[in-house]
Amino acid sequence: MAGPQGTELSYIGKGSFSIRVKGASAGLVPIGNVSAANVRVTEDKKELLDYQSAGGGQANALRRIQTVELGMTLRDFTADNIARALFGSASVVAAATGVTESVTGYHDALTPLGKAGVTNLVVKDVTDTTTYVAGTDYDLLRSGLWVYSSGSIGDGDTLHLTYDHPAQNVVEALVNAGLEYEVFLDGLNEAQSGKAVAIRFHRLRFGPVQDWGLIADDYGEIALTGDLLKDTTITTAGLSQYMKVTYV
């Protein structure tokens, strides 16, 4: 029961976000660790000044919501999160053994390989008759081949490779237009003994990531901002076409 000073209902939010493409026949999948999430509202304000008195002031004012945005700071670099940030597509390549690949090797330079995390690499010439020696003719880097000018491989030679590779995620960037999503927060209020908070964003369209640090000294983040749009599939009177907040 509220006292003379009102009810104490402070808020410190925590929780897990889930997402799915708007209209998809699929469940909402976890986004992962989100270190910050903020709803930002901008307004269009019309002011009518009082021109009838010397003291000034306002005769009337009109405030209309102009835009609503959801800003999120993602900390899990899943392939799906990266794809959303770069308007891309995500896929998984299964682990494989005995994979073959043909590349051109250049002296004292890096040749990228088609897969990452390669092991059990065998490098041969274009006729498959000469097997080159690791550490003398070439070195295997994390995702590429380094050819030594002091070795037996000629500059610009075609090389036949055989190797194994682990399962890996692949993101092809900038191949999709920005998709629309439904986002749900399964949250809690830490300031109120962890009581449940549920927020549903019915229709969001995210923009691309503005700044993605590829090399840094601290944990990385993906900062996304989405526009909250009107969901015309919700037609029941009294129900929001934008978002719904439920809390205990």
Language model: regions and residue ranges:
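Extended beta-strand solenoid/passenger and fiber regions
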Residues: 78-142, 164-199
